[in-house]
Amino acid sequence: MAKIVKIAPSVLSADFAKMGEEIESVKSADMIHMDVMDGVFVPNITFGIKMVADARKITSLPLDCHLMIVHPEKFVQKFAEAGADYITVHYEACGEGLADTLKLIKSSGVKCGLVINPDTPVEKIEKEIPLCDMVLVMS
């Protein structure tokens, strides 16, 4: 299997007051990475569904919504409707419900990604990898 490398700048480093300009400045990228943080699963809070919907209005680049939130399954459909092209979730947030969450993402019409922390053994996600369009190991 060939390795595919994609360039996906994160809007987390952008000036949110100039989001349109910031996204325009990376228009040659393969996709835009959007880190959605809830202040519970991770200590920071970023943005939610509206920011994704607003980004969708100003770019045709694929949007990768990286959900760093508890109970991501509750928000999959809303992020898909907002314009996400990929929804990536953490094994650590889904636990035993991981396969069901990945299937829910697929059934919502978007591509799914799986994220693991560096200390999570790959064996924990081996059987779910075939369900995924992308796998990300945090750094």
Model region roles, listed by residue range:
Residues 1-88, 92-100, 104-112, 125-132:
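Conserved N-terminal beta1-alpha1 strand-loop-helix module at the mouth
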Residues 115-139:
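Histidine/lysine/aspartate-rich catalytic loop segments that bind and position anionic ligands
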